[in-house]
Design a protein with these regions (language model features):
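Structural preference for solvent-exposed beta-strand-turn elements
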Residues: 1-170
Length: 170
């Protein structure tokens, strides 16, 4: 519901609200953190329920910072809420613990093609929920963005663009 409201705001007014409250939606917190960080000229306070503010997001924020993101913890280090100043990210090579959450990996992959250099993501440790990462890569491909997963590394080249020509109907 929170994402729907945010998207409706974008559609109606052309800009996101200054405060985005995702409630208890953990997936939305992870994906929107990456999306907002990679959206130039966007300043957002991303928050959620009291319980959401107890759920760690530090590994994702650190990975995004390595790509050049401007993200500040508004309360407690490693946890939402977040102050995000979006910009085009530099990209590059980053390492991420693979046993935390496949959603961190998916969030990074989905914004990787928008970076200046692309992203080479080195997964460290046993991969959590590999089928979800594979699903992310397949959906990205359906929308025109290719990722290559070889061993513990996933690469996404810069300059690829998501397209509307895909087999999905919403």
């Amino acid at each position: 519901q929170a994402i729907k409201q945010g998207l409706e705001t974008v559609k109606e007014e052309g800009a996101l609200p200054k405060v985005v409250d995702i409630g208890a939606a953990g997936t939305a917190m992870r994906f929107l953190t990456a999306l907002f960080a990679a959206t130039p000229h966007l300043e957002v306070f991303l928050t959620g329920s009291e319980r959401m503010q107890e759920r760690p997001i530090g590994a994702l924020v650190e990975a995004l910072r390595q790509l050049g993101a401007d993200i500040i913890y508004a309360k407690n280090e490693g946890f939402p809420p977040l102050r995000i100043r979006g910009k085009q990210l530099a990209g590059g090579t980053i390492s991420l613990p693979a046993d935390i959450s496949s959603q961190y990996v998916s969030a990074l992959l989905m914004i990787a093609s928008t970076t200046l250099q692309g992203v080479s993501l080195q997964l460290v440790g046993k991969v959590a929920s590999a089928p979800y990462i594979k699903m992310t890569i397949e959906v990205m491909k359906s929308f025109g963005v290719e990722a290559r997963w070889e061993g513990e590394r996933i690469g996404v080249e810069a300059g690829q663009h998501y397209t509307r020509n895909c087999p999905y109907v919403v």
